[in-house]
């Protein structure tokens, strides 16, 4: 039986401001990419999300990012490799303490936003992120885009790489994500998104914006929790996967 992990970005509120419905999403996903305070998330909110994840048996991952609260981590920062390494070490360590306090643990690492997109091709920053993870805990898998320089660097130093695809994001013909600034970068129809996910999981193929058929390696599907119909979309994806006989579980 085919199997797939479902992950979502959670803990991205700050103070009284909440982004998305973390509690509802934690009933759907099997892995939670929890913010670490650099692009979003405050300590009390992160502890709350980690406790909910622990209660529901959802695995916790450290969602590391550039130091960019104002831009929500969606702006490129030309940070030095040494500074980026230190920032990533700091973020993982902070979330490790919070997850432990909540009765769980950090089980993997996933870069966020502009950092995620940058290290698809930026080898220096990708190597810095990979090195930081190895220094903290060399057994932590990394979640990201197959074929990226980040994955190359992570594999080179012995880290496990777990390839993900995006439920609601469109792809360029070269397999990279369309920028959120471009029209059509984000899909919104839950039925279309759910069928697209089933196709990716069962056939290993996705359709680029120009109609090109892309080969995709998929061990996990990212469900964005900050879209207006996020819960409806995530529920549709899970229901369609179940209907197709696909086992939904955290990646091993």
Curated annotation (Swiss-Prot):
It comes from Mycobacterium leprae (strain TN). It catalyses: 5-oxo-L-proline + ATP + 2 H2O = L-glutamate + ADP + phosphate + H(+). Belongs to the LamB/PxpA family. HAMAP family: PxpA (MF_00691). Gene3D superfamilies: Glycoside hydrolase/deacetylase. InterPro entries: Glyco_hydro/deAcase_b/a-brl, LamB/YcsF/PxpA-like. One of its GO terms (biological process) is carbohydrate metabolic process. PANTHER family: 5-OXOPROLINASE SUBUNIT A, UNCHARACTERIZED PROTEIN YBGL-RELATED. CDD domains: LamB_YcsF_like. One of its GO terms (molecular function) is ATP binding. Keywords: ATP-binding, Hydrolase, Nucleotide-binding. This is 5-oxoprolinase subunit A.
């Amino acid at each position: 039986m085919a199997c797939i992990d479902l992950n979502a970005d959670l803990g991205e509120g700050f103070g009284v401001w909440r982004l998305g419905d973390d509690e509802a999403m934690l009933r759907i996903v099997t892995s939670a990419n929890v913010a670490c305070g650099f692009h979003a998330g405050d300590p009390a909110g992160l502890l709350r999300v980690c406790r909910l994840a622990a209660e529901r048996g959802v695995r916790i991952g450290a969602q590391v990012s550039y130091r960019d609260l104002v831009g929500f981590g969606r702006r490129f920062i030309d940070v030095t490799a040494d500074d980026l390494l230190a920032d990533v070490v700091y973020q993982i360590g902070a979330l490790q303490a919070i997850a432990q306090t909540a009765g769980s643990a950090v089980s993997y690492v996933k870069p966020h936003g502009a950092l995620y997109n940058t290290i698809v091709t930026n080898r220096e920053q990708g190597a810095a992120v990979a090195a930081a993870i190895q220094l903290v805990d060399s057994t932590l898998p990394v979640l990201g885009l197959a074929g990226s320089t980040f994955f190359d660097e992570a594999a080179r130093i012995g880290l496990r790489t777990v390839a993900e695809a995006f439920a609601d994001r469109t792809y360029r013909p070269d397999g990279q994500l369309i920028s959120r600034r471009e029209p059509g970068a984000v899909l919104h129809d839950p039925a279309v998104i759910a069928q697209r996910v089933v196709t990716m999981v069962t056939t290993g193929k996705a359709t680029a914006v120009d109609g090109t058929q892309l080969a995709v390696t998929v061990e996990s599907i990212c469900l964005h929790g900050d879209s207006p119909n996020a819960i409806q979309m995530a529920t549709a994806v899970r229901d369609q996967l179940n209907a197709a006989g696909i086992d939904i579980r955290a990646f091993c």
